[in-house]
From Swiss-Prot:
Main location: secreted
Entry keyword Disulfide bond: yes
Designated name of the protein: Coagulogen
Signal peptide: 1-20
Tissue and organ distribution: Hemolymph.
Cystine pairs: C28-C188, C30-C115, C80-C182, C85-C141, C95-C189, C108-C161, C147-C191, C155-C193
Subunit structure: Coagulogen is cleaved after Arg-38 and Arg-66 by a clotting enzyme contained in the hemocyte and activated by a bacterial endotoxin (lipopolysaccharide). This cleavage releases the peptide C and leaves 2 chains of coagulin, A and B, linked by two disulfide bonds. Coagulin molecules interlink to form a gel.
Keyword field: Disulfide bond, Hemolymph clotting, Secreted, Signal
Subcellular location: Secreted
Role this protein plays: Coagulogen is a gel-forming protein of hemolymph; it hinders the spread of invaders by immobilizing them.
């Protein structure tokens, strides 16, 4: 019995430590590592619960899914409205080459591909579930930026730039409290883009 309890305690501590100081943090928001099965970190049960919570807001405000881009009267949705999929546009963020490579063009074009992240890390390194509720008519999109590798004239998804880490404000959901938040989530970590 003691061995069984010890095993459960070790498993619990391992899970907590992995989530608290996660060594498997994605390089960028939309790049989900598979080592810990992160692609399925948000279960179907959780997705359904989030869908229901978002639907409750739209029902309360009497807003159809089609008109949900105005985000109703909920403060988290109003504040984080910039990244709603129907209204988001590719931004003018650029990544610049390191000094002293002046002979290369200084800017990389913004990639036109977007993704719909299901989880991310806040600027405090805390794991968050990012709200995606397609059935209720609410989806959040983040554009993938290309960065320049050190000393290279090629724009790609790897390498480094001189700018600070880019962050976006997205609607997140606290499962325990059933509350929506608008929080700063890291977009590019290993390949920072200008925010």
């Amino acid at each position: 019995m003691e061995k069984k309890l010890l095993g459960i305690a070790i498993l619990f501590v391992t899970v907590v430590s992995v989530l608290a100081g996660d060594p498997n943090v994605p390089t960028c928001l939309c790049e989900e590592p598979t080592l810990l099965g992160r692609k399925v970190i948000v279960s179907q049960e959780t997705k359904d619960k989030i869908e229901e919570a978002v639907q409750a807001i739209t029902d309360k405000d009497e807003i159809s899914g089609r008109g949900f881009s105005i985000f109703g009267g909920h403060p988290a949705f109003k504040e984080c409205g910039k990244y709603e999929c129907r209204t988001v546009t590719s931004e003018d963020s650029r990544c610049y080459n390191f000094f002293p490579f002046h002979h290369f063009p200084s800017e990389c074009p913004v990639s036109v591909s977007a993704c719909e992240p299901t989880f991310g890390y806040t600027t405090s390194n805390e794991l968050r579930i990012i709200v995606q509720a397609p059935k209720a008519g609410f989806r959040q999109c983040v554009w993938q930026h290309k960065c320049r590798a050190y000393g290279s004239n090629f724009c790609q998804r790897t390498g480094r730039c001189t700018q600070q880490r880019s962050v976006v404000r997205l609607v997140t959901y606290d499962l325990e409290k059933g509350v929506f938040f608008c929080e700063n989530v890291r977009t590019c970590c290993g390949c920072p883009c200008r925010s």
